[in-house]
Amino acid sequence: MNMRKLTILLMLIALWFGGSAQSLKPATPEQSKKMVETINKATSAVKSIQCDFTQVRQSTMLKEKQTSKGKMSFSGKNLKWEYTEPNKFALVVKEENGQQQVYIQQDGKTKKADGQSGQLFKGIAQIVMGSVTGTALSNSGDFTVEMYTQGTQWIAKLTPKQPKLKKMFTSIHLYFNDKHNAVTKVEMKEANGDMTTITFTNMKLNS
């Protein structure tokens, strides 16, 4: 391929991806208010969720992406995050005395998750549970919320305001389904530059 053809090809690629990026449109303040109200109303009717998930983590320290798969179940204020591939273990979030506690279940044993890993999952659990119940969008003390549209899909960009969350994440994107009552994908950009993307499939609500 000569230089001229290569230059044209690169320009076309740039235009293609540039056009794709521009398809994410920020909502107006009026639209954002109505979108958040619609999501809160829709999610308030969701009492339980069961689904599969695929988690892809891109670390700044590693060249290859790390992919995990599993199942998630949510009911009330409790969340179970069960990994089935490549390793088998479960993370369980329970509310005890008004505070979220994280436990690890593996090889028939249960232990409390402490330290950095426990704090990280508490943050993830807070985001997932907040998106399910709608509190992540309505609680202005935790996040600054910006709403976007991409075709018919609604996307919420959350920027943490709480010091604990700011230490873990710089931004979170929530992708909602067509009924706006559940999140189908979560993108979390961590403060250290790592990126975690969680995609939910085979979702069952209130089953």
Language model features with spans:
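Sec-dependent signal peptide recognition
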Residues: 4-10
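Hydrophobic h-region of N-terminal signal peptides that target proteins for export
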Residues: 11-20
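Gly/Pro-enriched, hydrophobic low-complexity segments
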Residues: 21, 136-207
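Flexible, processing/modification-adjacent segments and terminal tails
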Residues: 23-28, 35, 40-45, 57, ...
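Extracytoplasmic
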Residues: 46-48, 67-69, 76, 86-88, ...
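An N-terminal domain-cap segment
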Residues: 48-72
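A mature extracytoplasmic/lumenal domain signature
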Residues: 55, 83-87, 95-97, 106-108, ...
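An acidic-aromatic
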Residues: 69-126, 196
